[in-house]
Design a protein with these regions (language model features):
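Signature of Gram-negative outer-membrane beta-barrel scaffolds
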Residues: 324, 465, 469-472, 496-653, ...
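C-terminal beta-signal and adjacent terminal beta-strands/loops
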Residues: 845-892, 905-910, 916-1009
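Periplasmic N-terminal accessory/gating domains of Gram-negative outer-membrane beta-barrel systems
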Residues: 81, 86-99, 110-213, 217-222, ...
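Transmembrane beta-barrel wall of Gram-negative outer-membrane proteins
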Residues: 257-364, 384-406, 600
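Periplasm-facing N-terminal accessory domains of Gram-negative outer-membrane beta-barrel systems
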Residues: 19-115, 120, 182
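Membrane-embedded beta-barrel scaffold of Gram-negative outer-membrane proteins
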Residues: 407, 411, 655-657, 661, ...
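Short loop/turn motifs that connect adjacent beta-strands in outer-membrane beta-barrel proteins
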Residues: 213-215, 230-235, 272-275, 348, ...
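Gram-negative outer-membrane beta-barrel transporters
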Residues: 604, 726-733, 744-865
Length: 1009
């Protein structure tokens, strides 16, 4: 027991730093204003904290462990007038330089108070760090953490996914107050998975590669969000904004209302002298959560064609009609909150508690036009998705002396998600049972059998709609929880050298359960009459047979086969991936050289189940089920990752910097864990395994971490007191990227070396990314502030994502794996943003103009690469409604007319605006504002039909093959309405839209007390 306890303690103190130290550092020099002599022993204090330092023999001082925020720094010295500099911003993990020049009390009698300007050139950072502060965020027209991050140079946001410097999706690690907010099950890459109340953010820090040894868990970028801390006085803000000024599908000011309503409340302040708090809460509702261009149409005379078994000529339940820019049944409810609590136990010991919780609910089956159309008549009882996310962390900071401190962190994160029938909840055995529907009063007259619901409606040659009062035939739930601990030790060895050492350990518990075919499972269990109960000889046989894909298609781990009770051990127990790391880092800070040298150790142990013998796994022949006692777990991966960063502050206005580093990241575990022993049995069985990846058959245990080597070189230059630019060049070598590939025999068994066994995730893809980033910043001059971000880049590789090789796997006779790199799907050669902010301060411009401001945000990109393909020469397996996108949906039928990704979609330009007016009232500030997204209502083309190279024609109606269908009544008009006008076929093939979002106008009011 003692040995285990010691091992646990060592693990906590010596393994990885995924929880990032969030405090900043302040340094500078205190001198005599007249002579320039150092003022030895001058007292430097950070107002509102117990932090401070004394100047050394050269007048230099260093203050460690300052929480990010804006402070007033005070300096005093006997015989000199004190100086206070306010508005000094300290950033997480960075060094802020602030020098002081004190005048003798014989020359100046009164204390000097100065308001600091944010430095345009970061002198002490040795890599690309892009900061967005609460002041920057306040006037932006957009909302959402990921949307704000995507404004920076080096980023690409495409189809809702964020890419940084050419890395694949999911290669970004998110942290909130130092707590990891990323989930390794999914490697969150879409904006809805990472959310923070915008009014609670103190700063957002993007490190687009090149991060130092204390940071890990990502191949492409780190996004660190610091939450606000309560101040020395009570502060309350209330914000409400909405566009809900018109009914669904109707317009207000020429713009369709999305039914957007967002309310935010924040409260912060002190309790006594030692405790401070900050709380934020947000309620968000959207009647139409997916803003999309929808051209209205109305078909009132369509009838059933009888091709699903219904009566020929019978009327459909209602007209097939859509209103402009509105998707019915597409609402979303989202409630979340964050809070921080700081307790100063003494001048040396401080505690910080951070918490966050989010509850999100929306119906499934209506997220885009394709889903909304197919489910047009079944919106009365859609399947629901509820997701709950929470995180909490406690950090203790102990200042041993003014130059040394350590931090101890513990944190917990959790995510739970369910897709369920709103009437029956988790009791999925009732989902497809007619008797249960009758009990609730539903009309079941059209049900075919006791476990078989109504037939689909079908019109104009089998375009189908789901029926009313029908069963929901699937159910799923999953959960991920992590418990982590970390220690970081920092010491300012002398005024020039800082040493850091630390480590962290995270243990996850992951569970998943899904039923893919409930009606078949019910027939198998209870017979087609519902009364013939199947008997099983034992629980093992029941579990094996019920999980069969031919029966219920149940995938599970961490729950039993029924999804009722949790299973905590064994091969069907939860997955317990372990992530550990340790680092040592030395930062040398001189006036003309800053050197940051570090070494990081990472250990990743995914513990994936695999058969001991890949060629001939041990199987229960009677059930074709893998022998669970013969399974083993994959071995852990260990890496040493050097990091070297340095900067040359040539002058106060010019800094050169360069960086080299190695990075690793585990691919998302959802694809790797697959679905427990049932899924593994199908994938590796000598009877059912496939060499072609058919029917989603592949193994995940062959995957290992992906690697990146990055190089960076840049210059920061201040041209005037108010204007500066940064130029950065980067190069990335992308290694061991995941792809579908055949797992080959190693020659130690009965099969010859190189013989394919089955398909799995193999780290055989590779690529390169290179680019030039430029940022121009104009500090406010004569009411105008501006910032321009621009990126010129090229990303090439052998695969845009891990599934790019599915064609090569599915038919090796006509396809081959890429051996040469090409432009990837998300490559955007040119991308940028321009932000202009023009505003009148109080007392400026008279009573009408004072407090008035306008923020204009222009975003642009040159489009992304795609491959032109031939139009289909036959229907193949496509329907008369999907044939126009057949080759896009089924890559086996794709016939390119050019090398891969030789073409490019058109340029995109978008303008968002904010107009606001602040009124200073007696005890509070009142702000009225309007946000206008896509101000010119531009139909930006974000994707194209690969057959025609256009956004409004898939080519099918012009094909001679379409003649026989065009003769059908209403076929041409309906095809035009749903496919060419509203992209139903494109959604079906890709899951994406062709156009960006239409204009949205939101009006709001904000009160600050």
């Amino acid at each position: 027991m003692l040995r285990k306890a010691l091992l646990a303690v060592c693990a906590v103190f010596l393994l990885p730093a995924l929880l990032i130290a969030q405090d900043g550092k302040l340094r500078g020099r205190v001198t005599d204003k007249e002579s320039g002599d150092p003022l030895v022993g001058a007292n430097v204090t950070v107002d509102g904290t117990s932090l401070g330092a004394a100047a050394d023999l050269r007048g230099d001082y260093v203050v460690l462990g300052i929480p990010p925020g804006v402070y007033t720094i005070k300096v005093s010295y006997i015989g000199y007038q004190p100086v206070s500099i306010s508005n000094v911003r300290v950033n997480a993990g960075l060094t802020t330089t602030q020098d002081f020049k004190l005048a003798s009390s014989a020359i100046e009698v009164t204390a000097l108070e100065v308001v600091a300007e944010r430095p345009l050139v970061q002198r002490n950072t040795t890599n690309t760090v892009r900061l967005t502060t609460t002041e920057d965020i306040e006037n932006l027209p957009i909302r959402g953490l990921q949307n704000i991050v995507a404004l920076n140079a080096g980023t690409v946001q495409q189809n809702g996914t964020l890419y940084i410097r050419g890395g694949r999706s999911g290669e970004v690690a998110y942290f909130v107050d130092g707590i990891t907010a990323s989930n390794p099950m999914f490697n969150d890459s879409r904006s809805e998975n990472i959310s923070v109340v915008q009014e609670a953010i103190e700063e957002i820090q993007l490190q687009a590669g090149g991060f130092t040894a204390e940071h890990g868990g990502a191949n492409s970028g780190i996004v660190k969000t610091t939450l606000k801390t309560g101040g020395s006085a009570l502060r309350v803000t209330v914000d409400y904004r909405t566009d809900d000024f018109a009914k669904a599908g109707e317009e207000f000011l020429g713009t369709t209302s999305q039914g957007f309503r967002n309310a935010v409340l924040t409260v912060g302040g002190p309790v006594g002298s030692k405790f401070r708090y900050f709380l934020s809460g947000q309620h968000n509702y959207m009647r139409n959560r997916t803003a999309a261009f929808v051209d209205q149409f109305n078909f009132t005379t369509l009838t059933d064609d009888g091709l699903t078994g219904r009566t020929v000529g019978a009327s459909l339940p209602d007209a097939v009609a859509f209103k402009k820019n509105f998707l019915p049944g597409n609402q979303r409810y989202d409630n979340q909150g964050q809070g921080t609590f700081v307790y100063n136990l003494s001048n040396a010991i401080k505690f910080r508690l951070t918490g966050s919780y989010q509850h999100q609910k929306f119906p499934l089956g209506f997220a885009d036009f394709r889903q909304a159309l197919n489910n047009l008549f079944s919106g009365d009882r859609p399947q629901h998705l509820v997701t709950k996310r929470g995180l909490g962390g406690l950090k203790m900071t102990h200042l041993i002396n003014p130059n040394t401190f350590y931090e101890v962190n513990v944190n917990y994160t959790a995510r739970d998600s369910r897709t369920f029938d709103p009437d029956f909840g988790d009791d999925w055995l009732k989902y497809s049972d007619r008797r249960e529907f009758e009990k609730l009063g539903y009309d079941v007259s059209e049900w075919q059998k006791i476990f078989e619901g109504p037939l689909n409606y079908s019109t104009i040659f089998k375009f189908q709609f789901t029926p009313r009062n029908g069963p929901i035939n699937t159910y799923s739930k999953d959960s991920q929880q992590s418990l982590g601990a970390a220690v970081d030790f920092t010491s300012q060895v002398n005024k020039n050298i800082e040493m850091k050492i630390g480590g962290r350990f995270d243990r996850w518990t992951m569970r998943a359960y899904s039923v893919g075919d409930i009606d078949n499972a019910l027939v198998y269990l209870y017979g087609s009459d519902g009364n013939t109960i199947r008997n099983f000889p034992d629980d093992y046989v029941r579990r094996v047979e019920l999980a069969s894909g031919a029966v219920g298609g149940i995938n599970y781990y961490g729950w039993d086969v029924d999804g009722i009770n949790k299973v905590n051990s064994g091969p069907n127990g939860p997955q317990h991936p372990l992530f550990g790391s340790a680092y040592v880092q030395s930062k040398w800070e001189y006036r003309d050289l800053i050197l940051n040298v570090g070494l990081r150790y990472e250990r990743i142990d995914a513990k994936v189940l695999r058969p001991a013998n890949l060629e001939d796994p041990a199987f229960d022949k009677s059930n074709d089920f893998i022998q669970e006692d013969q399974l083993i777990r994959t071995d852990p991966y260990n890496y040493l990752l050097p990091r070297l960063n340095f900067a040359f502050p040539v002058t106060a206005n010019t800094v050169f910097y360069a960086q080299y580093g190695k990075y690793i990241q585990m691919p998302n575990l959802n694809d790797i864990y697959r679905g427990g022993t049932r899924r593994l049995s199908v994938d590796v069985s000598t009877i059912t395994r496939s060499l072609y990846g058919f029917f989603n058959q592949y193994v995940g245990f062959t995957a290992k971490p992906e690697r990146t080597d990055q190089y960076e070189l840049g210059i920061r230059q201040s041209l005037t007191d108010n204007f500066a630019f940064t130029v950065t060049a980067f190069y990335k070598d992308l290694k061991d990227q995941l792809r579908f590939d055949r797992v080959l025999a190693d020659g130690t068994g009965r099969l010859a070396a190189g013989t394919p066994i089955f398909v799995g995730w193999i780290n055989n893809d590779f690529g390169t990314a290179k680019g030039l980033e430029m940022t121009l910043e104009l500090r406010r001059v004569k009411r105008l502030a501006a910032r321009l971000n621009y990126t010129l880049s090229n990303t090439r590789g052998t695969g845009s994502d891990s599934r790019s090789t599915r064609v090569a796997v599915s038919d090796a006779t006509i396809s081959s794996y890429p051996t040469l790199i090409y432009n990837l799907d998300y490559n955007q050669a040119h991308r940028g943003t321009a932000m202009l902010d023009y505003r009148f301060n109080q007392g400026d411009g008279g009573s009408i103009l004072q407090g008035l401001g306008l923020n204009a945000l222009l975003t642009f990109n040159s489009g992304h690469n795609y491959t032109k393909i031939l139009e289909p020469s036959n229907l193949g397996q496509a329907s008369a409604w999907t044939v126009g996108t057949r080759a896009t949906q089924d890559p086996r039928t794709r016939n390119p007319v050019e090398p891969i990704n030789s073409s490019t979609t058109p340029w995109n330009f978008n303008v968002d605006l904010t107009l606001d007016k602040v009124f200073k009232l007696s005890s509070f500030d009142l702000k009225l504002y309007a946000n206008v997204l896509n101000a010119f209502n531009t139909r930006n083309i974000i994707n194209l039909y690969e057959t025609t190279g256009t956004a409004n024609d898939d080519g099918w109606l012009k094909s001679p093959l379409a003649a026989q269908y065009i003769e059908l009544a209403n076929y041409r008009d309906f095809y035009q309405a749903i496919n060419l006008d509203n992209r139903w076929g494109y959604y079906t093939a890709t899951g994406n839209d062709v156009y960006g979002a239409p204009r949205q106008i939101r009006f709001g009011v904000s009160i600050e007390y």
